[in-house]
């Protein structure tokens, strides 16, 4: 039996979908929509029933699904469905209605337009998948060094470590000097367990049992542990934050669940989608149709269960939109609390205050904002459409976000803030540019 390491935990059609999208974007005509006859419907259902009974993780549920499909076929329920895409969608609804398993999907997969309407061979399909993964940077969407020495990695799917491992190693080595880490999985719909295993291995010192897969066929259980060796430095004492959304699914969920159950990471965002079954894709002979059949289930060594149907609940609930700013503030709080260097502590506190202001702007009435508008030497402040803008002569214009009374941040300029001073009568008379290094530049008001 092939190891689950070579089977996808979600995202089973990612590369295929990318191939089709690329072809359409290149100007190719969409493939014709094939019709289905009664004979076609019976053949497709017969193939799917065989795969379910042979492979689906829960044999009793497989039997219920098979019985439903046979019953509805015999009753003529599907007679009005005459196109293949619609039939596949209906079968997916039927199967998920019984199993409540979002991994169980029947797909119409037309051949790419550039192969003359013929189904690609396995070698051609694999070559296409690898090419698209490479063009997509093996799902490593973005990597950054954020102010305050916080590392950030946006990972939108999970490529097989056998092809994307070098990129993962490069990413983790780029992040190696970080004082805190943020993994952004808000757009991660799943992928390969081997990539989870590789990246998680950088976060633990001792060998750690991350997850197991029970596989119904053969009644086997396979364990996944962190790797004994990684290329570069481990980040075992660096605080970790994982961003999630309702879209985060399958392998993306395992990544989060592993770190949550081991208390190695803090989950920030929304409860995830709830899919914990690895899948195998089966072709339906004679038709451009595949069925994703969950063949096993995840078993966490600490909780003894998984996230199927429930999702991974965040430790810090917030919207997906606010998750990054929320995690960034918490990361800076952690770094600030740990550091002994007073200069670094002051710099990190500055970043934390600015990030908090962006996340939770200080409320200022529009009438009060207009009171700041004016000219301050080389600096101009304008009130436009209920917002305040700052501009230094000869430079760009930036929005001012209230941080406190008479204190504003500029989101694009982490190192700079704008403060205003008042006279005894409460009138704004001076603008002071504040810098993260402690320097300040006062400018008296010269015009309103």
Predicted regions, residues:
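Bacterial N-terminal signal peptides that target proteins for export
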Residues: 2-14
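Bacterial N-terminal signal peptides
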Residues: 12-23
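Peripheral terminal and inter-domain segments
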Residues: 34, 341-448
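Mature N-terminal segment immediately following signal peptide/propeptide cleavage
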Residues: 39-64
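Terminal peptide-recognition signature
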Residues: 48, 95, 153, 183, ...
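Gly/Ser/Thr-rich loop/hinge elements
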Residues: 190-239, 243, 247, 277-285, ...
